[in-house]
């Protein structure tokens, strides 16, 4: 079989590339889902955002909380505040009256304290990029109002999964922009009033039902945005859809080429091995044994190609999905685990079965007739 080594190697390479890209791309989008979903849930990512420039009072919040179907709600504000003594640096200064809604995940330092008068919980990525640590002083300025505080903790937040200044900034730049949470007490003391332009809500209700009930509760028609209209969630979902598309198109081309190459190669192999097959039959070898012998080549090509492809797929997924990889510059999340969709294993098994079947059918065709027929 040394005569066919080049063809076998080429088939193994094509199968490995096809399965590698297939597994890698599907692992990428599946891992995004697997890591962002619990992160969003743990930090209370808001399903709905009720917005009004006039702001919402504690009574308004109570009306929303009393709606049947609302799991949690909190008043919320997020504004771009400058970091004093740092040129061009700013953070998304964020306040939530309910840490279970649009909250944070503590990576280092103290737990979030809603009554703190000087505590600042700062993005850990921004802190790393700018040499801030727990216990350091920091001053945030917004429209002439300064808030002097002490960094109590380093955090991540689902609301800031993709931390950019605005829609004009495509990629996060933690050297100049991050986010920070302060307590409602510190915020209200600094601005001198109780002003929250948003009520963020966690609820599994449909938008239509929630909008109707929220409008009835507040007594007016409010601007309500879903999580699909928020940057972090929609962009993460977009990456998932892109990965699904890429994982369906490119690998298919490689796998089709590999299968066609297998059909051609096995046909040529059995044609050239016609005399040897006839000799084996003349020596008393049964058809089943000859079938097993030649079919095993196709089977081993499928096994080796798929195994190499699986390893390649993990490498592709890891290269994209790790804190220092492509997605690491885009997403800010605590977990970077790799997940394999279960259907990948079934498809790999199906590929091996198809390749083995091709080998089996090619050889069986040559076994028809007597040994004398094969030796002619």
PLM region descriptions:
Residues 240, 244, 331-343:
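Membrane-interface segments at the starts/ends of alpha-helical transmembrane spans
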Residues 367-376:
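Short cytosolic juxtamembrane segments of multi-pass membrane proteins
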Residues 32, 43, 265-278:
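Transmembrane helix boundary and interhelical loop/hinge segments in multi-pass membrane proteins
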Residues 12-16, 252-255, 295, 299, ...:
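Residue-level signature of the transmembrane alpha-helical core
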Residues 263-268, 275, 299-331, 341-368:
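Small-residue-rich transmembrane alpha-helices
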Residues 2-3, 37-41, 275-282, 372-373:
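Short amphipathic alpha-helical coupling elements at transmembrane boundaries
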Residues 1-259, 287, 327:
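Membrane transport/envelope proteins' first extracytoplasmic loop
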């Amino acid at each position: 079989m040394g005569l066919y080594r080049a063809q076998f190697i080429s088939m193994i390479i094509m199968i490995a590339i096809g399965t590698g890209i297939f597994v890698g791309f599907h692992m990428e989008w599946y891992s995004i889902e697997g890591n962002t979903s619990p992160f969003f849930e743990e930090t209370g990512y808001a399903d709905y955002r009720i917005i009004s420039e006039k702001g919402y009072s504690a009574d308004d919040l109570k009306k929303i909380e009393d709606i049947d179907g609302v799991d949690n709600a909190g008043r919320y504000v997020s504004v771009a505040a400058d970091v004093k003594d740092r040129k061009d640096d700013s953070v998304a200064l964020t306040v939530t009256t309910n840490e279970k809604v649009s909250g944070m995940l503590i990576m280092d330092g103290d737990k979030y304290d809603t009554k703190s008068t000087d505590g600042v919980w700062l993005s850990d990525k921004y802190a790393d990029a700018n040499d801030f640590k727990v216990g350091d002083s920091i001053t945030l300025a917004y429209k002439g109002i300064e808030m002097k505080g002490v960094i109590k903790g380093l955090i991540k937040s689902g609301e800031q999964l993709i931390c950019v200044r605005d829609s004009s900034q495509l990629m996060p730049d933690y050297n100049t922009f991050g986010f920070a949470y302060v307590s409602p007490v510190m915020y209200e003391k600094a601005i001198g009033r109780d002003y929250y332009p948003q009520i963020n809500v966690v609820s599994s209700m449909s938008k239509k039902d929630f909008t109707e009930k929220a409008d009835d509760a507040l007594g007016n028609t409010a601007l309500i945005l879903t999580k699909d209209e928020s940057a972090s969630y929609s962009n993460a979902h977009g990456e998932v859809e892109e990965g699904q598309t890429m994982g369906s198109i490119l690998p298919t081309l490689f796998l089709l080429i590999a299968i066609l190459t297998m059909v051609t190669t096995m046909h040529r192999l059995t044609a050239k091995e016609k005399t040897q097959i006839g000799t084996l039959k003349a020596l008393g070898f049964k058809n089943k044994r000859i079938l097993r012998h030649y079919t095993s080549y196709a089977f081993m090509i499928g096994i080796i190609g798929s195994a190499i492809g699986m390893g390649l797929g993990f490498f592709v997924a890891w290269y994209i999905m790790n804190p220092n990889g492509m997605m690491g510059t885009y997403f800010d999340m605590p977990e970077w685990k790799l997940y394999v969709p279960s259907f990948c294993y079934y498809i790999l098994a199906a590929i091996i079965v198809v390749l083995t079947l091709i080998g089996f059918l090619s050889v069986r065709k040559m076994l028809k007739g007597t040994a004398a027929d094969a030796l002619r």
